[in-house]
Swiss-Prot record:
GO annotation, cellular component aspect: cytosolic ribosome; cytosolic small ribosomal subunit
A Pfam family annotated for this UniProt entry: eIF2A
Protein's recorded name: Eukaryotic translation initiation factor 2A
Family annotation (SUPFAM superfamilies): DPP6 N-terminal domain-like
Family: Belongs to the WD repeat EIF2A family.
Length: 642
């Protein structure tokens, strides 16, 4: 079975098989627009909300309705890491101040077919008026649940036998910061089998910010595994590595004291430890980066390295080990996105957003060698396939309301599938389920979504999703690509895997150098027949003054010898001061050519600015897109690119 991906529009949700067929597996059309939709990280469920209800789908093609909940105005959905819990956020009621607008539903159990919410009750419900950070945090296997109560972080222990044990009044563990005037604002549980918790406390009243990793144990949590104190930190972003033994913290200030950045200053810190709950010690370092903003930072799936894109454009791209030492650096380039493939074999670096959309694929196992390049302009979503052989790029609304669609690329840089939409809202790959599920034994119940054994399946299950194609000629290109190229011929070069536009007619020359060494191209005159003229120079005269004098004498002598062969040659007459001048006016065609060449030079200047990462106005981007039309107009007027 190949990978699957889903596409959400304002009217329906479509599920597609990936390479090589790209067949549409299922379409869930609704009478009402879909407000929110999300795939579970485990790949077992698809949840979507409308104005009147919330539905959960399951099955190989996500076409079986597992559960229908009669909830109105659900604007956000969230799955736990293992997919056992679905959280729904409703708009808070104005009439009822005690309205519990967040409900947590347990899904890893049998459900009657055509089950509705009247038959079940949520495992937990509470009030969260803000839509920011409203959901509970869960550990990797959903065996711990976390919720922050003012200054206390309370943890409950969960299991399949006690799935609704959300008793935060008698929690399994408590992490409190009542003893200090500073209180942590951000926390994140690690994805390890024996999880730990990282907390961030911003600086306040002259006291430095704190970053601490805590060991999770029953009762009051007091053991610190690793910690780091620093200034210049109003907020932060936390990212654990997949093994859960190291975390990156991007500290952010609201203002840049040097006034070089509108978005504040960035500093990156690394905390790591060894052994269960840090029994072998911890370590904390500040990662040394180039001056400037941090555009992206991400962990390798191996958990042994991480990559950072930082600095003013063109940015510096570096890779580090768990000690914070530089392993490898790439030349500076206009890039702001980095993504490791699921196996860690390939690394994608790209320049999206206000950059030109160039993408490079590096081979981590071959000394970071560049495997392929391609252009994916206007990309708002970029993700690796679960098998690690294909890349999805998409343009979605409301980020961009034009050229909406999805493209699938092979790691070799070849475009293999395209689908365009008038309005595309969301795209995502469906993750494979890494655990064994039960089989249906009772026709009246759904049971094939239940996981009882939490031992992961072999890694070969994920890697077999995408075929390994070493020879590019064996790659099967979907018919949609040819249709796309025929409709957009100017974009053909961006889908050929080399990321460069090849022009017929020799090497590229900038507009100001295209006519160097050649005469003027005059409409209707063969190339090379037109000669250069100097304004104010007598036709037929040379620009060399001495040569003109000799030619005058030679013509006078020849004329006198022809009229009177026996007569003595008369002295040559002085040059006439009233020589005729070239008063011929410039033709309308030449004026038009000059105007078009001026536009071409301006377009070339804008393209050079765009190539180095400068942000262009919308009108300037539109002007670049008129280059092809300008060249066609010049060709019609007889101008040729030499």
């Amino acid at each position: 079975m190949s990978s699957q991906f889903f596409l959400k529009t304002s009217q329906d949700i479509e599920l597609f098989q990936s390479y090589p067929t790209f067949e549409q597996s299922n379409t869930n059309s609704k009478d009402f627009p879909v407000i929110s939709s999300v795939l579970s990280p485990c790949g077992r469920f698809l949840a979507l909300s409308t104005k009147e209800n919330v539905k959960v789908f399951t099955g190989p093609c996500l076409d079986n309705v597992l559960l229908t909940m009669k909830l109105s105005d659900v604007y956000d959905l969230h799955f736990s890491p293992a997919g056992n819990y679905l959280s729904t956020w409703e708009r808070a009621s104005i009439q009822d101040p005690n309205h519990k607008n967040v409900k947590v539903w347990y899904l890893n159990k049998p459900f009657k077919k055509d089950c509705v919410s009247e038959d079940i009750v949520p495992a937990y419900e509470y009030q969260a008026k803000s839509q920011s950070g409203w959901f509970l945090q869960f550990s990797k296997l959903d065996n711990y649940g976390l919720r922050l109560f003012k200054h206390d972080l309370k943890i409950v222990k969960l299991s399949s036998a006690n799935a609704d044990n959300f008793d935060f009044q008698s929690p399994f563990a408590v992490l409190s910061d009542d003893e200090t005037s500073q209180h942590f604002t951000t926390y994140l549980i690690s994805p390890a089998e024996h999880p730990t918790i990282c907390t961030f406390t911003p600086e306040k009243g002259g006291k430095p910010a704190q970053l601490i990793i805590w060991a999770l144990s029953e009762g009051k949590i007091t053991k610190k595994i690793a910690s780091k104190t620093f200034f210049k930190a109003d907020s932060c972003q936390l990212k654990w590595n997949p093994l859960g033994n190291a975390i990156l913290c991007l500290a952010i200030t609201d203002f840049d004291s040097s006034n070089k950045s509108y978005y504040g200053e960035n500093t990156l810190y690394l905390l790591s430890f060894q052994g269960v709950n840090g029994t072998l010690g911890g370590n904390s370092v500040r990662v040394s980066l180039t001056t400037g903003p941090v555009h992206d930072f991400t962990w390798s799936p191996t958990s042994r390295q991480f990559g950072v894109i930082a600095g003013y454009m063109p940015a510096t791209i570096s890779f580090f080990d768990l000690r914070g030492n530089v392993v490898h650096s790439l030349p500076q380039q206009a890039k702001n996105t980095m993504l490791f493939s699921p196996s860690g074999h390939y690394i994608l670096i790209a320049g999206f957003g206000n950059l030109q959309g160039s993408v490079e694929i590096l081979d981590r196992l071959d000394k970071f060698k560049c495997v392929s390049k391609f252009d994916a302009t206007n990309t708002s979503v970029c993700k690796w396939s679960p098998g690690g052989e294909f890349i999805m790029t998409a343009t979605t609304s409301p980020r961009l309301r034009v050229d909406n669609g999805v493209k699938i690329w092979h790691v070799s840089g070849s475009l293999v599938f395209v689908k365009e939409f008038k309005e595309l809202l969301k795209v995502d790959w469906r993750s494979p389920c890494n655990y064994k599920t039960l089989e249906n034994k009772d026709e009246a119940f759904f049971e094939n979504h239940i996981i009882n054994n939490w031992e992961p399946l072999p890694d070969s299950t994920t890697s077999s999703l995408d075929p390994k194609i070493s020879n590019k000629s064996e790659l099967q290109i979907h018919s949609s690509v040819q249709e796309y190229i025929s409709q957009h011929p100017s974009r053909e070069a961006s889908s050929n895997g080399n990321g460069s536009k090849a022009k017929a007619g020799g090497a590229y020359k900038p507009p100001h150098a295209r006519r160097t060494g050649g005469g003027r191209i005059v409409p209707g005159v063969p190339p090379g027949a037109a000669k250069k003229t100097i304004p104010g120079l007598v036709p037929g005269m040379s620009a060399n003054k001495d040569a003109n004098t000799k030619n005058r004498r030679r013509r006078a002598n020849k004329k006198s010898s022809e009229t009177s062969p026996d007569s003595t040659p008369a002295p040559s007459a002085p040059a006439s001061t009233n020589a005729p001048t070239n008063n011929k006016e410039t033709s309308p065609e030449e004026k038009k050519i000059r105007s078009l060449l001026k536009k071409l030079r301006a377009i070339e200047t804008l393209k050079e600015r765009q190539a180095v990462g400068d942000k262009l106005e919308d009108t300037q981007v539109l002007k670049i897109q008129t280059e092809e039309k300008v060249l066609k107009d010049l060709e019609k007027l007889g101008w040729k690119d030499e």
